[in-house]
Amino acid sequence: MVSVTRSVFGDLPSGAGTVEKFQLQSDQLRVDIISWGCTITALEVKDRQGRASDVVLGFAELKEYLQKHPYFGAVVGRVANRIAKGTFTLDGKEYKLAINNGPNSLHGGVRGFDKVLWTPRVLSNGIEFSRVSPDGEEGYPGELKVWVTYTLDGGELVVNYRAQASQTTPVNLTNHSYFNLAGQGSPNIYDHEVTIEADAFLPVDETLIPTGEIAPVQGTAFDLRKPVELGKHLQEFHINGFDHNFCLKRSKEKQFCARVHHAGSGRVLEVYTTQPGIQFYTGNFLDGTLKGKTGAVYPKHSGFCLETQNWPNAVNQPHFPPVLLKPGEEYNHTTWFVFSVA
């Protein structure tokens, strides 16, 4: 049984609408999601003693989500991740996007899908959000109808993304939740044990755009096929953290891609997806300046993201998995976040 409770989270300035909160509860999980950016604001998971803690970074109030923040919990699009120099060419026409991350376009631009109000529809076991992204929004071609559905089933949070386009456009949707399985507000994620089921990753340039090479993980810091304790692993390889796409099988079938275990609490997160990639990000740009829920501060490496996705900058790399959605087709991807204790 899943209960869905609806409440007001806050009002947007200048009468631009009311943001609602939807609380989904199963016997194992409780998830709060708001209609601003389809954002997960809280996710309570029990530890091995049966004590529940909120394991996602975020804020208590709407005003904080309206200020600049690193996409805590939000759905990002029309194209998640980076597009080099904010440009791409389709059918001989060059499109110029908003530049909002160094020389590149990141997560859909200045006002991406994380910074808009979505229309909610309550389901028996979750919530569906929808919106229409108009032709030309943030420089992208064509009107795009989008649906994001969150459902609960026991210890599983399932996120489904669907989209239909009026003209050919790149589409790549993901959720940008930051997790800390010790509980949000814990100072770091160094004691988390991470596994990523990927034989290859994408090396990046200094602006975090993939170079185009598909590199084997074997013998590198990116070989996470067997569990590694994150803090020790970063030290051993002298790296600042991860912010890279790991290459999964291009099957479109549900596949296991990542597992994170926090030994102290016993909490385990496993991720399954139909997507061909997953961005593992270790909160390298968090700096402790943002004040989160319950007075928490979020310093560097205090949360991790597992963003299932198409490969970054795929629109400019013909040998990457196809990212273009054509009229008459449907974009349809699902990601499963499965929580348990061990």
Swiss-Prot record:
Reaction catalyzed: alpha-D-galactose = beta-D-galactose; alpha-D-glucose = beta-D-glucose
Binding-site residues, beta-D-galactose: N81, R82, H107, H176, S177, Y178, D243, Q279, E307
Enzyme Commission (EC) number: 5.1.3.3
GO MF terms, alphabetically ordered: aldose 1-epimerase activity; carbohydrate binding
Tagged with keyword Phosphoprotein: yes
CC terms in the record's Gene Ontology section: cytoplasm
Alphabetical list of SUPFAM superfamilies matching this protein: Galactose mutarotase-like
Pathway of action: Carbohydrate metabolism; hexose metabolism; Carbohydrate metabolism; galactose metabolism
Chain positions with Phosphoserine modification: S14, S124
GO biological process: galactose catabolic process via UDP-galactose, Leloir pathway; glucose metabolic process
Subcellular location: Cytoplasm
Gene3D superfamilies from the UniProt entry: 2.70.98.10
Alphabetical UniProt keywords: Carbohydrate metabolism, Cytoplasm, Isomerase, Phosphoprotein
Subunit record text: Monomer.
Listed PANTHER family: ALDOSE-1-EPIMERASE, GALACTOSE MUTAROTASE
Membership in a protein family: Belongs to the aldose epimerase family.
Physiological role: Mutarotase that catalyzes the interconversion of beta-D-galactose and alpha-D-galactose during galactose metabolism. Beta-D-galactose is metabolized in the liver into glucose 1-phosphate, the primary metabolic fuel, by the action of four enzymes that constitute the Leloir pathway: GALM, GALK1 (galactokinase), GALT (galactose-1-phosphate uridylyltransferase) and GALE (UDP-galactose-4'-epimerase). Involved in the maintenance of the equilibrium between the beta- and alpha-anomers of galactose, therefore ensuring a sufficient supply of the alpha-anomer for GALK1.
Protein name: Galactose mutarotase
